[in-house]
Amino acid sequence: MGFTVAIVGRPNVGKSTLFNRLVGRKLALVDDLPGVTRDRRIHDAKLYDLKFQVIDTAGLEEAANDSLEARMRAQTEAAIQEADVILFVVDAKNGLTPTDSTFAEVVRRSGKPVVLVANKAEARGAQSGMYDAFQLGLGEPCPISAEHGQGMPDLRDAIVELLGEERVFADEKEEETADEVFTPKAVGELIGDDIEDPDEEEIPAYDATKPLRIAIVGRPNAGKSTLINTMLGEDRLLTGPEAGITRDSISVDWEWRGRKIKLFDTAGLRRKSRVQEKLEKLSVADGLRAIRFAEVVIIVLDATIPFEKQDLQIADLIIREGRAPIIAFNKWDLIEDRQMVLADLYEKTARLLPQVRGLRAVPISGERGQGIDKLMENVVKTHEIWNRRVSTGRLNRWLAGVIAHQPPPAVSGRRLKVKYMTQVKTRPPGFVVSCSRPDAMPQSYVRYLINGLRETFDMPGVPIRLSLRTSDNPFAGRAKKKK
């Protein structure tokens, strides 16, 4: 086994469930009662093509030095020292606790590469807990469901990105040399005074060879299954004139221009008032889960009756979930005056969905196979933008120019001070601005900053998250201490 992974976190966040998932057997006891795991357990594990040793640990808790809990914590800290990479697990369903923040600092001080794992991401309301996890300063959360096995491809990719392919695929004979040359990096943690030379910050290039997950969504009978069948070149999915044929969220493997793609066909999404039968409610919930675990979401609109209220609600849901959206105007073969209609559709797209200015929209005919390549070219471009990262140095030089040109307005006679900006995540791009009195910052100025980011750094058509914080730079002074 080439490397070691330690699973750590507070009690009852799902560490043992994840351990069982990775080893492929129920070796660790799992229960809703916190504190079931006491000793650290080590076992051979596999995650797709990755082979490694995984350590299950007791939940980290504050405890007196001579208590059982303190000895359990010592076991966990020993596991941290043994590990090459740490999976720090939080409960996205129930959100963060002060204990999470306390032990995130313990993990950070270890200096080991850390994957922040947001478990129970399939639960209703988990998105809020996942966003809260950014404040731990451990980088972008990786949403998973250890119980249901969802999000495992992203977890695999996160481990490879941190350790590097040479390290994770090294033979056992190469382990010692791999350990010597490895230097952990966490670009998402670099903010403020912690950066000595922003221009040297490395931004990884977009990997166009990685498998891509695409969900196909829309109102009933918009032509979603027909589109997928045309892509595949076979009648893989049941289609017909009756609305609502698709019930399950079906995933199929496909390859486009040498790139592996997983397509998710979903049940037609109706208004809640029209979703009555239990089976249909389950189908819609399944479709929503497919959206959450997809990367790019193609919104299929019937070009003959586009932009119904339900279409806009679906688009808004996708944007709020932070997915990379793209519109496919289907049934284009039924349109007569195509040039005039297309101009009208582009105008409506910009006017009705201003929160993703520059959203890509492509006319297609799923039945005749027209426009599929152009649609996929735009899918790949949107996915690249969704993964885009901007160096902290470039961001703050841009921010200084923005403030000089258009400073934040004064509120109650006091000028708002903006200190610095950093990008804390991708997928979608997320930024944090440190400023005085964030609650007083007008939303109009926040939108001004978002629009400026979108235009300056070429990020059209994807959601952009921007949060304001008043706390001091948590990494300030660290560089000074190292001297």
Curated annotation (Swiss-Prot):
The record's section on PROSITE patterns has: G_ENGA
Q: Does the keyword GTP-binding apply?
A: yes
Residue span, EngA-type G domain: 3-167, 212-387
GO biological-process terms attached to the record: ribosome biogenesis
The segment(s) forming the KH-like domain are: 388-472
What are the UniProt keywords, alphabetically? Answer: GTP-binding, Nucleotide-binding, Repeat, Ribosome biogenesis
Quote the record's binding site residues for GTP 2: 218-225, 265-269, 330-333
Gene Ontology MF terms: GTP binding
Where along this sequence does the record place binding of GTP 1? 9-16, 56-60, 119-122
Per UniProt, subunit arrangement is: Associates with the 50S ribosomal subunit.
**Protein's job:** GTPase that plays an essential role in the late steps of ribosome biogenesis.
Family named by the database record: Belongs to the TRAFAC class TrmE-Era-EngA-EngB-Septin-like GTPase superfamily. EngA (Der) GTPase family.
Against PANTHER family, the record matches this protein to:
GTPASE DER (PTHR43834:SF6)
Q: What is this protein called?
A: GTPase Der
Task: Give the species this sequence originates from.
Answer: Brucella anthropi (strain ATCC 49188 / DSM 6882 / CCUG 24695 / JCM 21032 / LMG 3331 / NBRC 15819 / NCTC 12168 / Alc 37) (Ochrobactrum anthropi)
User: What gene name is listed for this protein?
Assistant: der
